From Swiss-Prot:
The keyword Cytoplasm applies. It comes from the Eukaryota. One of its GO terms (cellular component) is cytoplasm. One of its GO terms (molecular function) is calcium ion binding. It is found in: Cytoplasm. It holds the Pfam family TCTP. Involved in calcium binding and microtubule stabilization. Keywords: Calcium, Cytoplasm. This is Translationally-controlled tumor protein homolog. Residues 1-167 form the TCTP domain. Belongs to the TCTP family.
Amino acid sequence: MIVYQDLLSGDELLSDSFPYKELYNGVLWEVEGKWVVQGAVDVDIGANPSAEGGDEEGVKIRLVKVVDIVDTFRLQEQPPFDKKQFLGFIKRYIKNLATKLSEERQAEFKKNVEGAAKMLVSKLSDLQFFVGESMHDDGSMVFAYYKDGATDPTFLYFADGLKEVKC
């Protein structure tokens, strides 16, 4: 199994269990999330309920709907950004990330990241923002939105901000 960690914070953000599609010459990865139902069962094996006057069966099921990617990697949702805040984050993130890339990759990244950033700005009001479990200030941001008519979210990752780790 391959896990993709945030290059800047080390948080696990994705794995090869979730196929991705490259956008903007590989600058962004698009990953389809799914709503899943998780449940916990509580079984009361205590005293005889009829003797205590209770009619309960002793089994309680609690179901919770979660998004698989958010739950699996313990992503933490962040408050929405306005355009000024978002542009400030993107500039800082690109600057921090570029220092971690090879010179050759830096040039390619800088050439293609502008289109990706413009697309994100155009969807800003539709985006949900997530960070890794550590909530590191300078770490990667994971973006989620719903495509037209979709019931499951689509996630966007900066590919160069991910480090491949084999487990």
